[in-house]
């Protein structure tokens, strides 16, 4: 995270958290602006020893499902648009996002498929309301491919090729979704 922040990365670092844990996780980001300011005031070792204020923990769902990722191979939005979207983030958006992340974790731990689908869909709607530019045509195709299947999908990430993620609740739906994503390119 330190190196990415130093290079001006705008992301939540959720991708790094997933890579570090190699698991389905609950992740709440640190205050990136606060850490950037600390980077200018203290050396690396001191900064790394400090509490960055993030939360991360593995989630063990009580429901069998596949976690699928479809990569668009193209950024959803440019760095300028990322900054515009970032400036549009309101306390209401952040509160709504936190509410959905917490509800999703609870639903996963309880094995409540309907609540999982509802939370993912509401999180997707929050992103779309924040900026329609987030859902490029390719991301819309990835998301819409899940409709009518026993799964739910949403956009995830911004940068060098955005992703659609999906939770699929049966093998047939997983196979159909993967095929639809492959056919879409």
Where is each model-derived feature located?
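C-terminal nucleotide
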Residues: 2-10, 14-158, 165-185
């Amino acid at each position: 995270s330190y190196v990415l922040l130093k290079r001006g990365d705008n992301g939540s670092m959720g991708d790094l958290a997933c890579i570090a844990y190699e698991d389905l996780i609950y992740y709440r980001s640190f205050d990136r602006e606060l850490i950037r300011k600390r980077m200018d005031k203290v050396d690396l070792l001191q900064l790394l020893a400090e509490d960055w204020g993030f939360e991360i923990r593995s989630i063990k769902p009580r429901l069998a499902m596949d976690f699928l990722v479809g990569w668009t191979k193209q950024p959803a939005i440019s760095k300028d648009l990322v900054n515009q979207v970032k400036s549009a983030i309101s306390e209401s958006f952040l509160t709504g996002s936190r509410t959905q992340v917490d509800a999703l974790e609870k639903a996963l731990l309880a094995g409540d498929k309907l609540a999982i689908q509802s939370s993912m869909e509401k999180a997707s709607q929050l992103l779309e309301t924040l900026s329609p530019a987030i859902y490029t045509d390719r991301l819309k195709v990835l998301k819409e491919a899940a409709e009518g299947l026993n799964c739910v999908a949403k956009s995830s990430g911004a940068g060098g090729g955005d992703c659609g993620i999906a939770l699929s609740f049966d093998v047939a739906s997983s196979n159909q979704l993967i095929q639809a994503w492959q056919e879409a390119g």
